[in-house]
């Protein structure tokens, strides 16, 4: 079975280094002329799939914006996942789950077991209960060719108080996470399947990312304030592993399908230039 890291490397090579979020928050639905209800949600998600599913490497639905409509919203999420995967995009579900024991194993099954209606290519997780507590996620991902992205240095300013705090051995909390994920990915080729979330807004990290040997998801671009040029400052020698992530900057171009594609093409060109220096 092809690993997630290998699939991601292949699809990014084919489609380019870009992840686009599906974040149907009320203000964006209104901007698109849609009602803030399940019908509006379904039309929004369907339009994004039509516009980008066959051309963007990774699409990242934010689960909360579907969950807020209850079971009908989750049904739309399930349908969106199926459509995206059929169109050839890798689906990264933004859920930021984190727990222990049988509970984290249940989360793993919900998102990474092929028999689940919410089965996706990868998920985001929180390491606050300890990176080791996420072992069921890592194990099922490895068994099923899935991926996991662990929060490390996030784009929100509140995160620094925890992530840059020092542990007993002098490392920051973020560095501890980085080191443990580096061990999980050791020896993987062409890329490990456990990635990190590192915000594009944070400037020079002061942390060593080159040894991670896994994908580095970079949110915070566009509406959150970072530009593609900031990627070189944040990631330095780790640029080849970076997966830039845009949401509102692309989605604001909707609901016109052609305009959405044009917005995605523009930010992809910016990302290529930033990551390659050309």
UniProtKB/Swiss-Prot annotation:
PANTHER family: OROTIDINE 5'-PHOSPHATE DECARBOXYLASE. The keyword Membrane does not apply. Its EC number is 4.1.1.23. One of its GO terms (biological process) is 'de novo' pyrimidine nucleobase biosynthetic process. The lineage of its organism: Bacteria, Bacillati, Actinomycetota, Actinomycetes, Micromonosporales. GO terms for molecular function: orotidine-5'-phosphate decarboxylase activity. PROSITE patterns: OMPDECASE. It comes from the Bacteria. Pfam families: OMPdecase. InterPro entries: Aldolase_TIM, OMPdecase_AS, OMPdecase_type-2, OMPdeCOase_dom, RibuloseP-bd_barrel. The active site is at residue 96. The keyword Transferase does not apply. The gene is pyrF. Belongs to the OMP decarboxylase family. Type 2 subfamily. This is Orotidine 5'-phosphate decarboxylase. Pathway: Pyrimidine metabolism; UMP biosynthesis via de novo pathway; UMP from orotate: step 2/2. It catalyses: orotidine 5'-phosphate + H(+) = UMP + CO2. Keywords: Decarboxylase, Lyase, Pyrimidine biosynthesis. It is an enzyme of class 4 (lyase).
């Amino acid at each position: 079975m092809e690993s997630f890291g290998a699939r991601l490397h292949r699809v990014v090579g084919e489609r380019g280094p870009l992840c686009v979020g599906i974040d149907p928050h009320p203000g964006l639905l209104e901007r698109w002329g849609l009602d803030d209800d399940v019908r509006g949600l379904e039309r929004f998600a369907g339009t994004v799939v039509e516009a980008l599913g066959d051309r963007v490497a990774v699409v990242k639905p934010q689960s909360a914006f579907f969950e807020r409509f209850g079971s009908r919203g989750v049904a739309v999420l399930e349908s969106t996942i199926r459509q995206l995967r059929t169109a050839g995009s890798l689906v990264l579900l933004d859920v930021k789950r984190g727990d222990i024991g049988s509970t984290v194993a249940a989360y793993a099954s919900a998102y990474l077991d092929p028999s689940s209606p919410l089965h996706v290519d990868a998920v985001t997780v929180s390491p606050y209960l300890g990176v080791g507590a996420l072992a069921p996620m890592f194990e099922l991902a490895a068994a099923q060719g899935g991926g996991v992205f662990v929060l490390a240095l996030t784009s929100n300013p509140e995160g620094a108080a925890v992530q840059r705090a020092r542990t007993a051995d002098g490392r920051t909390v973020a560095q501890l996470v980085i080191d443990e994920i580096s061990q999980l990915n050791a020896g993987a080729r062409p890329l490990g399947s456990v990635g990190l979330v590192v915000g594009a807004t944070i400037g020079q990290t002061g942390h060593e990312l080159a040894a991670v040997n896994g994908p580095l998801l970079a949110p915070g671009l566009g509406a959150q304030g970072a530009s593609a040029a900031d990627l070189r400052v944040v990631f330095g020698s780790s640029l080849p592993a970076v997966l830039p992530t845009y949401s509102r900057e692309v989605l604001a171009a909707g609901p016109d399908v052609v305009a959405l594609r044009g917005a995605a093409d523009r930010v992809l060109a910016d990302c290529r230039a930033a990551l390659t220096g050309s």
